From Swiss-Prot:
Record protein name field: Expansin-like A3
Positions annotated with a glycan in the UniProt record: N99, N102
Organism, scientific name: Arabidopsis thaliana (Mouse-ear cress)
Top-level taxonomic group: Eukaryota
PANTHER family found in the cross-reference section: EXPANSIN-B3, EXPANSIN-LIKE A1-RELATED
Amino acid sequence: MRSFLYLIVVIFLFSSSVNACDRCLHRSKASYFSSASALSSGACAYGPMATSFFAGHIAAAIPSIYKDGAGCGACFQVRCKNPKLCNSKGTIVMVTDLNTSNQTDLVLSSRAFRAMAKPVVGVDKYLLKQGIVDVEYQRVPCNYGKRNLNVRVEEASKKPNYLAIKLLYQGGQTEVVGIDIAPVGSSQWSYMSRSHGAVWATDKVPTGALQFKFTVTGGYDGKTVWSKRVLPANWNSGRIYDAGVQITDIAQEGCDTCGHIWN
C-alpha cells in the first residue's frame, strides 16, 4: 500500500512537470524582497537558516515550482534580460518560499537580484530601482560540494509522541516524495508525512537510534536513498544531524522538447 502511495505521488509530480518542465528555459518576470525579515519567514519553514543557503541567494517561487513544499530546496539559475544592466550568467537561487503573486514567477532576495547585474560600480543599485525585471530561468542541480544531506530535528519534536524533521543541503535536481523511519536494525518501517513546506512529521516515534530512507524522483521513477548515519537514541530538538549520504540524482521529466535553451 505504501509503495502504491509513493507511485501516486511520483506520477503526480511528473504530471505537474509536464506543465512546468523545470529543465526548460522559462521566460517571466522577477522582483525582490524589500524587507530582509521576510527571508526568514518563508513557507518552506527554513527560518533564519534560509539566508545561509547559497550565500543568501534565495527565492520565493510560484505554486507550480513550490509544489506544495516538494519544491523547497530546489535550485534555479536566473538572469535578467536588460542587456544594459544584466550580466549573461545571472545567479543560482534556492527556493525557500511560496510566491502567490500573479505578477512574477520569482521573488528574489535583494542579494540575488543584485547578482544579476553587470559587474560595474553602481549598476546593481540601479537594477534594484527597476523593482520588477524580465528574466529567464531554468532548474539546475543543487551542489553543496562535499557536504552531506542533513536532518534537522524541529523544536516541536517531543519523545515519544512526535518527531518533526526537515532536510537541509539536499543536492541534485529532484524532489523527496517520501520519508520512512525505523529503529536501527529493524525492518519495521513507518512513514512520515509532509507537515508543511520542507517539514516532515510523525506521531509514531520508534524508540532508540533511528534510521531513515528517502524516496526521491530519480530518473523516470522513484528511487530509495538510505541514510548511512542514524539519528542517535538521545536525539534533541533543534539539533542538526548528518545523514551520511547526499542526493545527486536528476529527475528525468516526461515533457516535450524545450522551446528555448540557455545560451
